[in-house]
Design a protein with these regions (language model features):
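Long amphipathic all-alpha helical oligomerization modules
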Residues: 109-174
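Amphipathic alpha-helix face/heptad-repeat signature
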Residues: 23, 49, 53-56, 82-85, ...
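Short helix-adjacent coil turns
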Residues: 12-19, 104-110
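Long, charged all-alpha helical bundle/coiled-coil segments in cytosolic proteins
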Residues: 21-79
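A structural signal for well-ordered alpha-helices, especially hydrophobic packing surfaces
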Residues: 5, 9-12, 31-38, 57, ...
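Charged, alpha-helix-forming regions
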Residues: 16, 21-23, 33-42, 127-134, ...
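Long, charged alpha-helical scaffolding segments
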Residues: 60-110, 115, 129, 160-163, ...
Length: 174
């Protein structure tokens, strides 16, 4: 499931949305199998490896939705726990940074500001979450890390925009 979800995120960055959807569909099928197989084994169902798999699945689904400008799926729709969903939401911020950096390299700034705003919004939502660490599986650390990711991205975007303006002015002079 983690492999499918990770491959889906890579497909999103290659702009292969159909492949990403297929991979996430496969991951979703495995998730339903896991839920069915472990339904009578609560301790295993709530073990860390299931949480990690759900988190990766959430990250893939959220990243695909945000980049493709689709409605954000909720944890109920994905069939995962709230804690896994929030962790996946936090992890998607790093994928949005990658999307922005890839866009800057392609000199396509059309959605960079929008994605930075989305990153800020995710951070704002995660700041309001107050789960015990036992349930949140590192969400507080993820939230703390996100702030730095956003600020580095903001700096990279600002430098790129300023360089673009400088280049345009130099072309006007030349």
């Amino acid at each position: 499931m983690i492999r499918y979800s990770s491959a889906a995120v890579r497909a999103v960055h290659r702009q292969e949305q159909d492949e990403a959807r297929q991979l996430l569909d496969s991951a979703g099928e495995l998730l339903r199998e896991i839920d069915g197989d472990l339904a009578e084994h609560e301790r295993l169902l709530h073990a860390g490896f299931v949480h990690d798999a759900q988190k990766e699945f959430a990250e893939g689904c959220i990243t695909l939705a945000l980049i493709c400008e689709k409605a954000l799926p909720g944890p109920e729709t994905l069939g995962i726990s709230n804690a896994s969903y929030l962790d996946g939401l936090g992890e998607s911020v790093g994928e949005l940074r990658r999307y922005i950096l890839d866009s800057l390299r392609r000199e396509d700034l059309s959605r960079c500001e929008e994605m930075l705003t989305v990153m800020d919004a995710i951070y704002g939502v995660l700041l309001t979450m107050d789960f015990p660490e036992l349930l949140a599986h590192g969400l507080r650390h993820t939230t703390d890390t996100i702030r730095g990711v956003i600020e580095r991205t903001r700096g990279d975007l600002t430098v790129s925009l300023r360089q673009r303006k400088l280049k345009a002015r130099l072309n006007d002079l030349g």
